[in-house]
Amino acid sequence: MNVTRISDAPEYQAPNHHDMTCLRLQGREAGPAEQLWLGLSVIAPGGHTGLDPSPMEKHYVVIEGELTLTGEVPGQSAQSVVLRPLDSCRFAPGEKRQLVNHSNSVAKVLLAMPFDPPAAK
């Protein structure tokens, strides 16, 4: 068993993330993991990510506050949705994704992401 207390969770920097604090809860520098890692992002009012693709599948669960998530699959129009506590969203590998905190309160979101992209089919 590997326990990471929130007070001990290492902070990490993610590219194109603005007005956000990103903490590693499990995996990578937070401890052993074989297939995925968990992170917690604390997003200030007005904080956001870029609308960027990733080769990794990503799963988000809003823990606190409200976030607007936008996804865009190549060749399709972008789709946005507002998530509130315990709402979740999955982004497919290669799908562009953006998180924006349009509210006046801090938002917290849990991220689960594999270490490696899916194998070629």
PLM regions and their residue ranges:
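Histidine-centered metal-chelating micro-motifs
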Residues: 47-50, 68, 88-89, 93-99
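A short, N-terminal "cap"/entry segment at the start of jelly-roll beta-barrel domains
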Residues: 1-35, 120-121
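Ligand-binding loop in jelly-roll beta-barrel domains
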Residues: 84-85, 93-118
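Conserved short histidine dyad/triad with adjacent acidic residue
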Residues: 24-26, 39-54, 93
